C-alpha cells in the first residue's frame, strides 16, 4: 500500500524503476545519475570534431597536461621525444621542421599529438620507426622513415602491434621498406 512512482532514465537504455524515493534518496540518485550520464557522454565524445572510424572515440591525453615542444632535437628538455615519454599529455609545437630521430620513437599511452599547432611547414619525423602507445591521437605529422640509417629491421614508418585505440588524422607516411603504416 505504499504509493509508488515511476522513474524513467533516458540514456542508451530506457531504464524504468518502480520505486518510492525519500527526498534525500532522490537527491543522491539524481546526483549519481547526472554523474553517470556525464561520464558516459564524455566517454563517447569524438577524439576531435569530424573523427571517423574505429578510433573515433579514443581519448588520448584529454584532460592531461599540455606539453610544448620547443626544439627539433632528438632528445632532452623541450624535445618531442621527451614530451611523449609519459602520458596523460597533450603535445603542442612551438617550432616547425624536421626532427632527425636517432632511434625508434616510443610514444606512451594516453597521448594526444597536435601537429597542426606547429608553424608552417609543420613537423616531419625522419630516419626511425614511430611506435605509438595505446589510446593515442596523432594529428598532422609527416613520418619519413628512409634507408639512410642502413638498418635491416623491416623499416616500417610506424609500428602498432598489440596496441589499441589509435587514430591518425592528416598524417602522411612514406619512404618505408616494408609496410608504411
Residue ranges and their predicted role:
Residues 1-44:
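Bacterial Sec-dependent N-terminal signal peptides
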Residues 46-91:
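Acidic Gly/Asp/Thr-rich repetitive segments characteristic of extracellular carbohydrate-active
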Residues 64-66, 153-155, 178:
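Short, solvent-exposed beta-strand edge segments and adjacent coil->beta transition regions
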Residues 70, 114, 169:
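Residue-level detector of conserved, well-ordered beta-strand and adjacent loop positions
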Residues 72, 94-96, 116, 176:
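Active-site-proximal beta-strand/loop segments in catalytic clefts of secreted hydrolases
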Residues 81-87, 98-114, 121-140, 145-164:
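Extracellular beta-strand-rich solenoid/capping regions of secreted or surface-exposed proteins
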Residues 171-172, 177-181:
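Active-site cradle of extracellular carbohydrate-active enzymes
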Amino acid at each position: 500500500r505504499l504509493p509508488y512512482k515511476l522513474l524513467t532514465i533516458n540514456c542508451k537504455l530506457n531504464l524504468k524503476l518502480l520505486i518510492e524515493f525519500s527526498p534525500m534518496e532522490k537527491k543522491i540518485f539524481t546526483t549519481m545519475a547526472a554523474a553517470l550520464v556525464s561520464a558516459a557522454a564524455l566517454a563517447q565524445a569524438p577524439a576531435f570534431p569530424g573523427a571517423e572510424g574505429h578510433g573515433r572515440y579514443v581519448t588520448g591525453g584529454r584532460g592531461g597536461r599540455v606539453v610544448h615542444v620547443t626544439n627539433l632535437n632528438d632528445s632532452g628538455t623541450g624535445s618531442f621525444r621527451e614530451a611523449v615519454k609519459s602520458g596523460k599529455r597533450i603535445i603542442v609545437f612551438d617550432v616547425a621542421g624536421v626532427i632527425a630521430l636517432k632511434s625508434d620513437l616510443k610514444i606512451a599511452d594516453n597521448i594526444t599529438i597536435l601537429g597542426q599547432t606547429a608553424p608552417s611547414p609543420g613537423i616531419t619525423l625522419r630516419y626511425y620507426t614511430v611506435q605509438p602507445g595505446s589510446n593515442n591521437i596523432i594529428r598532422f605529422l609527416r613520418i619519413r622513415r628512409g634507408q639512410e640509417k642502413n638498418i635491416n629491421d623491416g623499416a616500417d614508418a610506424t609500428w602498432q602491434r598489440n596496441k589499441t585505440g589509435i587514430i591518425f588524422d592528416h598524417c602522411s607516411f612514406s619512404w618505408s621498406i616494408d609496410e608504411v603504416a
